[in-house]
């Protein structure tokens, strides 16, 4: 438990004896009692307590809206535009990668449909005993309506007794509407503070500006284009009240960037993972986790988090070393923090009763050139020898300047964190760990068609299977040209999750991708012979580099075996 870790590892000033701890708890209880007096005029009779009427009222009441208002109850809006209006909408998408033209026409106070498990409504909270939170929202050149809708959503769904403040951190925006106009608007709202960076900091350091100024016991980080579901805050704070070393994420519901439809789901949420490119991925909850749950609304352990929305004890955040300040833009920082939470004694969880809608932009609205360096820092500090699996699939990452990680490694040693093998074995056993045997991974190059390699680039990142494997000029950058020949005689395309294996369907001669199986089917087995011949076990035919008939490109096909160099293949780890 983290409590033991604090006594064993924290500085002397934080080591308290049993008497001091009891005194501290007594003071906390007295503080809660005084707050109860000042807010309600009555004194609770003492434990066991039940929530008092009215104690969960939000900071601001939500104003009534017409039932037919645009986007009411999270409904999709599809405007029929033409001429100048259509041009303005397209311009807003180009600038923000979100349909801001539509967002500006949807109320800042719209209600969302109920998208949580009905059991969540039955949960009772002891509001006087829950910690108060500071909600930190960093932004850079955000559109007016999406930013203000986020702020109002927090104020109109968060119990007043639980919300210490909302801290908006302006990361050196240069848009006119985010200057005096924003300051004037926010000055009229209760519990809202605006902090402005004096230079462009990037998401990580901007969030740290907010965290350092926060007065709440819990830090709740949100992105700047969110809408909070009713009852989103209480489950996060309740869980941290129960276990201070738990970092808790809400269920992230999608808000469509174009129609602003709220696509929440009351069913089982997904959890976070990653692939060996160190790209965050979503996954279904594994059976082992389901078996440990007593109720469908129990917290769900997650190997990683998306990173934009989570709550953490401020004290525990500081103990863990907060964010890695060597990181700037978003990307990679979420995996680094996820690894650190787990390896250093905490838990990372998703709470099914906490839902927050998030507008996922069409694509990133600004450059994230330093995201690769973030991933390299995460690999260097936390992944031990497994970082080589990342570098094999991202050769360019070896050349990426990533700064000094000496202090982060000292932090890992100070906190006596576990190794990455423990993380893979204990936290994420579902992730396949590649073998990467020398001479059997990298670019699979053809000997006859010189300079051409197997290449697979599915059009949909979320559906890796079902498309033909092709041949393109070797580029040496891994990714879509990285393959591994395993001891199970598979040719794995394992840069992404879920992993895919080259397959030949019965009666056909084209090589396509299908999901790898626990037991290797015959149509996924290939024999790589010493002379480089690649034989498909089921058909007994050889893989040959062949010109495609329709588009003059090249692709591998099954052909009767010959002595042709076009049927000989070899792995090459990097471009010479």
Swiss-Prot record:
GO terms for cellular component: Golgi membrane. It is found in: Golgi apparatus membrane. It is a single-pass type II membrane protein. Residues 130-239 are annotated as: Catalytic subdomain A. It catalyses: L-seryl-[protein] + UDP-N-acetyl-alpha-D-galactosamine = a 3-O-[N-acetyl-alpha-D-galactosaminyl]-L-seryl-[protein] + UDP + H(+); L-threonyl-[protein] + UDP-N-acetyl-alpha-D-galactosamine = a 3-O-[N-acetyl-alpha-D-galactosaminyl]-L-threonyl-[protein] + UDP + H(+). Gene3D superfamilies: 2.80.10.50, Spore Coat Polysaccharide Biosynthesis Protein SpsA, Chain A (3.90.550.10). Its EC number is 2.4.1.41. Residues 1-19 are cytoplasmic. Disulfide bonds join 120-353, 344-417, 453-474, 501-516, 542-561. Substrate binds at residues 171, 200, 330, 366. Keywords: Disulfide bond, Glycosyltransferase, Golgi apparatus, Lectin, Manganese, Membrane, Metal-binding, Signal-anchor, Transferase, Transmembrane, Transmembrane helix. Its main location: Golgi. It comes from the Eukaryota. Catalyzes the initial reaction in O-linked oligosaccharide biosynthesis, the transfer of an N-acetyl-D-galactosamine residue to a serine or threonine residue on the protein receptor. Has activity toward non-glycosylated peptides such as Muc5AC, Muc1a and EA2, and no detectable activity with Muc2 and Muc7. Displays enzymatic activity toward the Gal-NAc-Muc5AC glycopeptide, but no detectable activity to mono-GalNAc-glycosylated Muc1a, Muc2, Muc7 and EA2. May play an important role in the initial step of mucin-type oligosaccharide biosynthesis in digestive organs. There are two conserved domains in the glycosyltransferase region: the N-terminal domain (domain A, also called GT1 motif), which is probably involved in manganese coordination and substrate binding and the C-terminal domain (domain B, also called Gal/GalNAc-T motif), which is probably involved in catalytic reaction and UDP-Gal binding. The ricin B-type lectin domain binds to GalNAc and contributes to the glycopeptide specificity. Belongs to the glycosyltransferase 2 family. GalNAc-T subfamily. This is Polypeptide N-acetylgalactosaminyltransferase 12. It comes from Mus musculus. The gene is Galnt12.
């Amino acid at each position: 438990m983290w409590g033991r870790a604090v006594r064993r590892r924290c500085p002397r000033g934080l080591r308290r004896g049993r008497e001091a701890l009891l005194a501290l708890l007594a003071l906390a209880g007295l503080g809660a009692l005084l707050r109860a007096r000042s807010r309600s005029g009555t004194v609770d009779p003492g434990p066991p307590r039940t929530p008092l009427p009215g104690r969960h009222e939000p900071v601001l009441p939500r104003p009534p809206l017409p039932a037919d208002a645009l986007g009411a109850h999270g409904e999709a809006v599809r405007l029929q535009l033409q001429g100048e209006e259509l041009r303005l909408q397209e311009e807003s998408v180009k600038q923000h990668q979100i349909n801001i033209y539509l967002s500006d026409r949807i109320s800042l106070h719209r209600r969302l449909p109920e998208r949580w498990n009905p059991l969540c409504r039955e949960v009772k909270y002891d509001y006087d005993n829950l910690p108060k939170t500071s909600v930190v929202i960093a932004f850079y050149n955000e559109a007016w309506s999406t930013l203000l809708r986020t702020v109002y959503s927090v104020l109109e769904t968060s119990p007043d007794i639980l919300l210490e403040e909302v801290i908006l951190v302006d990361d050196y925006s240069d848009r006119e509407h985010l200057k005096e106009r924003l300051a004037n608007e926010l000055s009229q709202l209760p519990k809202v503070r605006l902090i402005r960076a004096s230079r462009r900091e990037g998401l990580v350091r901007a969030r740290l500006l907010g965290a350092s100024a926060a007065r709440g016991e819990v830090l709740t980080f949100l992105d700047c284009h969110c809408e909070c579901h009713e009852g989103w805050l209480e489950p996060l704070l309740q869980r941290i009240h129960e276990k201070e070393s738990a970092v808790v994420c809400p269920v992230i519901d999608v808000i469509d960037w174009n129609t602003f439809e709220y696509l929440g789901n009351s069913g089982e949420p997904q959890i976070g993972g990653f692939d060996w490119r160190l790209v965050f991925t979503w996954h279904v909850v594994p059976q082992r986790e389901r078996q440990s749950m007593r109720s469908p609304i129990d917290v769900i352990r997650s190997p990683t988090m998306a990173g934009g929305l989570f709550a953490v004890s401020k004290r525990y955040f500081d103990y863990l070393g907060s964010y890695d300040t060597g990181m700037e833009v978003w990307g990679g920082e979420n995996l680094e923090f996820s690894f650190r939470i787990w390896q250093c004694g905490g838990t990372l969880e998703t709470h099914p009763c906490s839902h927050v809608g998030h507008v996922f932009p069409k694509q990133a609205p600004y450059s994230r050139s330093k995201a690769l360096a973030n991933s390299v820092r995460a690999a260097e500090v936390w992944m031990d020898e497994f970082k080589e699996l990342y570098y094999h699939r991202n050769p360019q990452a070896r050349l990426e300047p990533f700064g000094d990680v000496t202090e982060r490694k000292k932090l890992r040693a100070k906190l006596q964190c576990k190794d990455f093998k423990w993380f893979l074995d204990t936290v994420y056993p579902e992730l396949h760990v590649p073998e990467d045997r020398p001479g059997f991974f990298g670019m699979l190059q053809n000997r006859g068609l010189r300079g051409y390699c197997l290449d697979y680039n599915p059009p949909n990142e979320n559906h890796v299977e079902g498309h033909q494997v092709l041949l393109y000029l070797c580029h040496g950058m891994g990714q879509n040209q990285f393959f591994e020949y395993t001891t199970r005689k598979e040719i794995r395309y394992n840069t992404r999750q879920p992993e895919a294996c080259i397959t030949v369907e019965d009666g056909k001669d084209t090589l396509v991708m299908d999901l790898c199986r626990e037991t290797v089917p015959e149509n996924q087995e290939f024999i790589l012979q010493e002379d480089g011949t690649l034989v498909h076990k089921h058909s007994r035919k050889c893989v040959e580099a062949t010109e495609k008939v329709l588009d003059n490109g090249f692709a591998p096909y099954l052909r009767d075996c010959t002595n042709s160099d076009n049927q000989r293949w070899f792995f090459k780890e990097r471009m010479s």
